[in-house]
Amino acid sequence: MSEQVALNPSEISELIRKKIDQFSVVSEARNEGTIVSLKDGIVRLHGLADVMAGEMIEFPGGVYGLALNLERDSVGAVILGDSSTLAEGQKGKCTGRILEVPVGKGLLGRVVDALGNPIDGKGPIESSGMSPIEKVAPGVITRKSVDQPVQTGLKAIDAMIPVGRGQRELIIGDRQTGKTAIAIDAIINQKGTGVKCVYVAIGQKASSVASIVRKLEEHGALEHTIVVVAGASDSAALQYIAPYSGCTMGEYFMERGEDALIVYDDLTKQAWAYRQISLLLRRPPGREAYPGDIFYLHSRLLERAARINADEVEKLTNGEVKGKTGSLTALPIIETQAGDVSAFVPTNVISITDGQIFLDVDLFNSGVRPAINSGLSVSRVGGAAQTKIMKKLGGGTRLALAQFRELEAFSQFASDLDDATRKQLERGQRITELMKQKQYSPLTVAEMGVSLFVVEKGYLDDVPVNEISSFEASLHDYMRSTHAALLHAINEAGAYDNEIEAKLKKAVEEFKNTGSW
């Protein structure tokens, strides 16, 4: 006979109670949608009810998308990265976050992609935190007027088209006219000034970017620069967000009472990427097939470049930084087609920025480099930021060049010229020759001041045009070796008075007497 097992009800109920107590229920409310179509890096989802515009959507395999189109029964999103692992029928869920990138001093000296991931093989980045790529630009009350210069180290720019801290100065010209060269020279010239730089490469060849990074490294400028790359092989989505990512990285320094410089190279390619995304999302096309908000694309980016006052810096740092203003200076680059500055995107960006540096193909091909067209170039707010010596000595340069260009065109038809006209033409030729400058050889304020002084005071009038370059180089060497204290004094204060003028006059006359050029 089998042995009967005695069941004690109280023991059973105790066991059940224990099991219930130990059972953990973690519920997760998720807003999920299903992929109904996937093509050309654009995904359409059905069932995402509470998604926000610009929100990150997470897909299987750690792939993220950006919600751009919110329609009645579906959501249009653009894939950030590789979409080859996704398929129709898969789920996409809301994250409740907008796109953020790492910021901080740990990014300096590094090359990152549009999402802030390192691509230079130097290991992970120690960032100071994350910051959203889209921010509201500083308001009128929080801004401070531009009155400090950003020295580019290029005579033609610092004398005629000065750039101030917090300004937006457009560099515009056809392909292969030296636009990137000007921007890279400006970054190299910030070495030792405390200005942090961000270089955003949009739609460029990987070989070109590698060459730029190598040049920055050679000149010791990479250690104060962040390079953000959305190359030609990257998706249109990454090319579209790269400038915003770079801007956020630059704003980190501005908000802490420091000065930063950002170069967008170039915004034409960002506009093309955004046009591609908009057409794939079936948004109605407008002029040149660009969407209706193409102006807003660039204005909301460039308005974030500003100089903010000390109160705003103190507020943003919770009182940690007091009495310091912060600035973000932008140098956007626009590529024109056959010199057409009246096309849609160039006119938009010209109207947004505080001036433009116009580069001319004909000048470039005739050997005038940097090929700056002084007649079409302008700086709307930089004059207030110019140092005294540059303002005093460089003031007449622009006018003299403009008159020279006019007379040059006229003199081609005239057979005999009077003395005054001939003198003006010769002076213009000498100024044009003096404004030429080799790449990667930025000058200090004092060196530029000396060059402008000799042309302003007529010391070049008896120097043959073809010897001006060697004259200038020898003069700079002479000043560095025998008048270093004077150069140091000018560099420190940027001042120009009767005493400095007398010293410069004496030094230049001494040099001319040696005839050593």
From Swiss-Prot:
Species whose genome carries this gene: Legionella pneumophila subsp. pneumophila (strain Philadelphia 1 / ATCC 33152 / DSM 7513)
Known partners and oligomeric status: F-type ATPases have 2 components, CF(1) - the catalytic core - and CF(0) - the membrane proton channel. CF(1) has five subunits: alpha(3), beta(3), gamma(1), delta(1), epsilon(1). CF(0) has three main subunits: a(1), b(2) and c(9-12). The alpha and beta chains form an alternating ring which encloses part of the gamma chain. CF(1) is attached to CF(0) by a central stalk formed by the gamma and epsilon chains, while a peripheral stalk is formed by the delta and b chains.
UniProt xrefs under InterPro entries: ATP_synth_asu-like_sf (IPR023366), ATP_synth_asu_C (IPR000793), ATP_synth_asu_C_sf (IPR038376), ATP_synth_F1_a_nt-bd_dom (IPR033732), ATP_synth_F1_asu (IPR005294), ATPase_a/bsu_AS (IPR020003), ATPase_F1/V1/A1_a/bsu_N (IPR004100), ATPase_F1/V1/A1_a/bsu_N_sf (IPR036121)
Annotated ATP binding sites: 173-180
Primary residence: membrane
Membrane association type: Peripheral membrane protein
Source superkingdom: Bacteria
Key words, A-Z: ATP synthesis, ATP-binding, Cell inner membrane, Cell membrane, CF(1), Hydrogen ion transport, Ion transport, Membrane, Nucleotide-binding, Translocase, Transport
Marked site (Required for activity) residue numbers: 377
Protein family according to the UniProt entry: Belongs to the ATPase alpha/beta chains family.
Record localization: Cell inner membrane
Reaction catalysed by this enzyme: ATP + H2O + 4 H(+)(in) = ADP + phosphate + 5 H(+)(out)
Protein name: ATP synthase subunit alpha 2
